[in-house]
Every structure is written in C-alpha cells, then in structure tokens.
C-alpha cells in the first residue's frame, strides 16, 4: 500500500494551513462587510441558551460521524470502542482542514493503523465511510426534491434554473463512486482503463498502487455489504447526522427572529446546498459551502438575513467543530501512546 495512504499531519503543514484558513476567513469577512450592521444586530438577538443549542447541533455532526466509524470498523477490528470511533472522527475533521482538504482519509487511516488495523483495510473502510456519506447526501436531497419540487419550481429564478443540471452532474459522480466500490463489473472496467496509463516508471507505480487499492476496496465492500444490519445502522446514523445539520439554519433563523421560512423548506434548501457544494471547488472545506448557501438562500431571504444565517451556521458547523477537533485530535494522540495497539 502507498506510503502516503496513512499519514500524521506535520506541524509545519498545520501552521501553513491555519494561515490559509485565517486568510480565507478574512476574505469572507470582507465579503460580508456591507451587511455587518445587520449581522451584528441579528447575532445580538441570541441568548446564551440559544448559542449553546446551536453549538450543540454543530458538534453533533462529528460525534455522529464517530458513531459511524465505530459501526464500520468494529466488525474488522475487534475491541474497537465508541470512543475510538469518535477519536477517529476528530482525526478526520482536523486532518481535512490542516491538509487543506486532502488529508481526512490518510489521517484517519493513520489513526486506525496505530489502533491495530492494517493500512489496506483502513483505507478501504474509510473510503467506504465516505461513500456511505455521499450516498446518504444524494438520497436525502432526492427525497426532499420529490416532496417539494413543485414549490421549488414555482420559486426558482436566476441561476437556480441551472439547479437540475448541477443535480444531475453531482448525482452521476456519486453514483459512479458507489459503483466503483460495490460493482465487480465497474471495478474490472477501472482496471482495464488503468492499463492505458503512460508506461513510465512513475505512472506504473501509481497504477500498481491504484490496482492494490481497488482490490482492497472490493474486499472490504463485500465484507461490509454482506452485513445488512450494519449497513442499515450506518445509513440511519448518516441520515440523523444530516437531519441535525440541516436543522441548524432553521434554528438560526428562528433564534435571530428573521423572515419566516418553514422547517420543511429549510430542510430542502440546506440539503440541496450541501449536495451542490460537491460540484464546487473548496479549500479545507471553505468556499463551496458559502457559495452554495448564498446561491440557494438568496432567493428566499433578504441579503442581510442570508449573511446573518450563514455567519452563525458556519461558526457552529465549521469553526467551532474545527476547534473541538484540534483538542480531540491531540487527546486521541495522547491516548494512542498510552494504549497498546490491538490486532485486527
């Protein structure tokens, strides 16, 4: 397995990534500056308990992601605990930011390897967890669209007219990713396509690594999909994770006493926001969410209110979660040094 499949983020790279994060935050603040008075007035409506509820919903996302890790890994690594699953989620969240979006799976694989799981199965299981997440995002957005497509069509203007095209493109990408993981036919086609890579030493090494990862992914997917009860648990946890995340903008609107937008409408718009963000470029999880949020919500709320909701939503779902993940990551490291690894 490729030596970069499992890696611990370096301190130098982490500092550089934090500087990039700070720069991007400054850019967002500059974008919001014309509505700063409205944003601060809206945030001033919040009391302590409302802030705690919003932050609790934000932190529920990585905690439920940790529950998913626990359910996925425990069948492969006997003795893997719920706390280790949550530690693994902290590693993924922290690694995703400090490696500018490239390191969630490698850092999680590194943690699982330290906990006793070989690198190959670790990469396979974390890739499958990612695929379960993307599949649930697709299914959730599709159900919301089916239930409320008439309302959305009647209120769609401007760039939102291109939403069906964006939906189709992202859906095709997610379906292709799922098929690579679960379909032997598609895996064989992928192996055949890799045979057309350049015959240089560098590309042939990459081909060998990718072929090995395909084999491991096929093995792990067959083992996991054979356990139907575990798959149902994973989908249920993923759906709950998304439901709570999609409740967050609705609570932000209610707590800041902004223009009313029903709970069902917010569920639809936020699920589409997360879905469409998959088609947009991002750096360390920033950029795509903000763009998709403004795109979806600007047709239904005044500009100042959209900016206010976006600000509180990102504080709870990104900045607070990242700060918690930094603490969680270093505590996970400390626990690893105190606990001998268990064999898979």
Regions found by a protein language model. Give the residues of each.
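Transmembrane helix-loop-helix hairpins in multi-pass inner-membrane proteins
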Residues: 1-41, 92-204, 282, 286-344
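Membrane-helix interface segments
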Residues: 10-11, 47-49, 78-87, 117-119, ...
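Membrane-interface helix starts
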Residues: 13-16, 45-53, 222-236
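A short amphipathic helical element positioned immediately N-terminal to and/or at the very start
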Residues: 38-45, 213-225
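Hydrophobic alpha-helical transmembrane segments
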Residues: 51-55, 82, 86, 123, ...
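Membrane-embedded helical hairpins/re-entrant loop segments and their flanking transmembrane helices
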Residues: 64-91, 252-269
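Alpha-helical transmembrane segments of multi-pass membrane proteins
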Residues: 83-92, 128, 264-275, 305-313
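Transmembrane helical segments that form the transport core of multi-pass membrane transport proteins
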Residues: 221, 225-272, 280
